[in-house]
């Protein structure tokens, strides 16, 4: 926990929430338990989820690249933060002797290599720039369920759990939505201070506009993803239903805010 910063959104509470969603998926989905029978695979999943945003600075990759930060230079403008999270993860694990613990086991070196490969692949895939590529392969896996290796399952479970806020209770989902927009605003202020271009949605956004952004994210990213995952893992349908309910609540939320805006405008 000490290696997570006090960012509005990308903090230890986020990592813990993602880990809980992933653990819930593993516990409830029979097909997932079959695909991830090996203890090293399950251990890799839990370590990847809890570490996937470790030491996150509270801004996105675009900020790192635009500001030509040390991390952007180090990782050649490519999945900057995800590469950084991988690096910090293994620095911390090695510092605490996990590699030595592996070395004491039978075939420990091979197990460590497998663990490292699975965790790195999964964390790097949390870069949303890779989402369309992951979605395409997910649709292929629906047609051919044997396509995914155990390592692939770790990658897809982490990415799914990372997109899981709106499958939680409505009040919890709203709290996370509020946090991400606070983080956007914080980044926008830093960009202004550095004289960088600022995305309008990050600086000033009404509640109605925020609702429209979230509704679009649900329609074009979350629903297609979770519905596809539920085709592979039917036990996820309850979370898909919660997601659909959240979408309906956002529709009501938008109508109420638009109505208030109309009344306020008429009053002017």
Model regions and ranges:
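Short glycine/proline-rich turn/loop motifs
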Residues: 1-5
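Divalent metal-dependent phosphate-bond-processing catalytic cores, especially two-metal-ion Mg2+/Mn2+ enzymes
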Residues: 9-10, 24-39, 47-268
């Amino acid at each position: 926990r000490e290696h997570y910063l006090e960012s509005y959104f990308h903090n230890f509470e986020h990592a813990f929430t993602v880990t809980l969603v992933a653990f819930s998926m593993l516990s409830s989905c029979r097909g997932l338990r079959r695909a991830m029978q090996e203890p090293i695979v399950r251990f890799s999943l839990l370590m990847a989820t809890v570490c996937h945003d470790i030491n996150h600075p509270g801004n996105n990759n675009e900020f790192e690249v635009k500001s030509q930060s040390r991390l952007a230079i180090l990782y050649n403008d490519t999945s900057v933060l995800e590469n950084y999270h991988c690096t910090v993860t293994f620095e911390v694990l090695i510092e605490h002797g996990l590699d030595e613990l592996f070395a004491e086991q039978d075939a420990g070196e091979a197990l460590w290599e497998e663990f490292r490969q699975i965790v790195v692949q999964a964390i790097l895939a949390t870069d949303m720039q890779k989402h369309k590529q992951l979605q395409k392969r997910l649709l292929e896996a629906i047609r051919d369920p044997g396509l995914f290796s155990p390592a692939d399952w770790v990658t897809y479970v982490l990415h799914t759990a990372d997109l899981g806020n709106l499958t939680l209770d409505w009040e919890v989902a709203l709290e996370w939505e509020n946090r991400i927009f606070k983080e956007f605003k914080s980044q926008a202020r830093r960009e202004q201070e550095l004289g960088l271009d600022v995305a309008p949605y990050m600086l000033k956004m009404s509640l109605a506009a925020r609702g429209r952004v979230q509704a679009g994210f649900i329609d074009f990213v979350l629903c297609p993803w979770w519905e596809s995952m539920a085709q592979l893992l039917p036990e996820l349908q309850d979370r898909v239903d919660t997601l659909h309910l959240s979408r309906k609540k956002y529709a009501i939320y938008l109508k109420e805010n638009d109505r208030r805006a109309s009344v306020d405008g008429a009053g002017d």
